[in-house]
């Protein structure tokens, strides 16, 4: 099998809540998502999606996905998409860094591998380890009482795990954490995610002020070293996300006991190939994961579901159904939330079919 063409689509994904806000005043109202279609000489087509969380969350941005694909695509025409290791080596040789731009190529090749072998991706990624996966709900940064009310609403929909967007004023964040924890059941999980927004002294204040609560602290500070400093000052369970951006940083974090859990975002690390490697390293070292991505719609959600379903439940801290946050469907067959959980299709590959009436014409074609 050979790649004959790579088509690139752009689609806007508005939010049901109107705005998603996180640390340092950052927010997005409409996400800019990129969908990739790989055509082959055997008629099979593979699909993937990449949707950065704006331009201030990670070193990634929406136009960068499409610029990266423009650089990568000419090197991939004529290559065997089922030889995914070689595809990744070609991409790494052609473009240093920029894993998020490589991710949709990698994922689309996995989709093709599933279709070529007649197997769903969760089978290829390790086999079904659970029937469905528990989801968390991200609570956009607002006033404490508004966030608490939103948590109550989502709890009524079946969610039992919540990620609270903090990383603003330390006093406000202390109030946010107390207000939201107070409306949850004892068995519900709450993660206070600062998204690198606190300085070290602010983080120290917050973890001290909420030390009596059942809450996880996620990515308090900008750097690995600052975050680990806070880790050493608290007994609260600790999650790292932004600073665990590949296998090397994961190995360092494991060796230095830097975290209890990680947030594994598929596009952040370059696609399913490296995400699977990191997933397996985490399992080997007893590190549970939130399995997700930066953002996306139906196709991103399908990739998340397959990786999460092939991960044992005791190592799946949670996953994300991004397609429930938006108002636009871009693919048929995508996972749908049922009582705070989701599962995958059993169809080959990702099990989705893009809705081209929504995607429109490609913004770029490489052949």
UniProtKB/Swiss-Prot annotation:
Cofactor(s) needed by this chain: Mg(2+)
GO biological process: alpha-amino acid metabolic process; cellular response to amino acid stimulus
Catalysis performed (reactions): cis-3-hydroxy-L-proline = 1-pyrroline-2-carboxylate + H2O
Catalytic activity, EC: 4.2.1.171
Key words of the record: Isomerase, Lyase, Magnesium, Metal-binding
Cofactor binding, per record: Binds 1 Mg(2+) ion per subunit.
Active site per database record: 165, 265
Gene3D superfamilies to which the protein is assigned, alphabetical: Enolase-like C-terminal domain (3.20.20.120), Enolase-like, N-terminal domain (3.30.390.10)
Main EC class the enzyme belongs to: lyase
Top-level lineage group: Bacteria
Expression triggers: Is up-regulated when the bacterium is grown on c3LHyp or t3LHyp as sole carbon source.
One Pfam family of this chain: MR_MLE_C
Single GO MF descriptor: isomerase activity
CDD domains: MR_like
Record-listed Mg(2+) binding positions: 193, 218, 241
NCBIfam families found in the cross-reference section: HProlDhtase
PANTHER family: D-GALACTONATE DEHYDRATASE-RELATED, ENOLASE SUPERFAMILY MEMBER DDB_G0284701
Protein's name according to its UniProt entry: Cis-3-hydroxy-L-proline dehydratase
Annotated organism of origin: Roseibium aggregatum (strain ATCC 25650 / DSM 13394 / JCM 20685 / NBRC 16684 / NCIMB 2208 / IAM 12614 / B1)
């Amino acid at each position: 099998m050979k790649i004959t063409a790579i088509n690139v689509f752009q689609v806007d994904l508005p939010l049901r809540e109107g705005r998603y806000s996180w640390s340092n005043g950052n927010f997005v109202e409409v996400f800019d998502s990129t969908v990739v279609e790989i055509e082959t000489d055997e008629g099979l087509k593979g699909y993937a999606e990449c949707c950065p969380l704006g331009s201030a969350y990670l070193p990634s941005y929406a136009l960068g996905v499409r610029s990266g694909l423009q650089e990568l695509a000419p090197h991939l025409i004529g290559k065997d998409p089922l030889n995914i290791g070689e595809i990744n080596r070609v991409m790494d040789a052609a473009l240093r860094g920029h894993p998020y731009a490589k991710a949709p190529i990698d994922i689309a090749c996995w989709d093709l591998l599933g279709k070529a072998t007649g197997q769903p991706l969760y089978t290829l990624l390790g086999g079904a380890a659970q029937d469905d996966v528990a989801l968390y709900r991200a609570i956009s940064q607002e006033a404490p009482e508004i966030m608490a009310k939103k948590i109550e609403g989502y709890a009524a929909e079946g969610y039992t795990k919540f990620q609270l967007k903090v990383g603003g004023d330390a006093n406000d964040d202390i109030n946010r954490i107390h207000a939201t924890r107070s409306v949850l059941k004892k068995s519900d999980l709450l993660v206070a995610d600062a998204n690198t927004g606190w300085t070290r002294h602010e983080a120290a204040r917050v973890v001290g002020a909420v030390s009596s609560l059942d809450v996880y602290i996620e990515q308090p500070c900008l750097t690995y070293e600052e975050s680990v400093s806070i880790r050493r000052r608290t007994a609260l369970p600790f999650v790292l996300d932004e600073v665990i951006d590949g296998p090397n940083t994961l190995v360092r974090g494991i060796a230095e006991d830097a975290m209890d859990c990680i947030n594994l975002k598929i596009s952040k690390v370059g696609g399913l190939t490296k995400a699977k490697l990191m997933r397996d390293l985490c399992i080997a070292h007893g590190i549970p994961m939130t399995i997700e991505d930066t953002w996306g719609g139906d196709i991103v959600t399908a990739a998340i579901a397959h990786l999460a379903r092939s991960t044992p439940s005791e190592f799946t801290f949670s996953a994300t159904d991004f397609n429930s946050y938006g108002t636009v469907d871009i693919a048929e067959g995508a996972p749908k939330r049922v009582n705070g959980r989701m599962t995958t299709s059993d169809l080959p590959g990702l099990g989705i079919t893009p809705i081209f009436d929504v995607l429109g014409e490609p913004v770029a074609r490489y052949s």
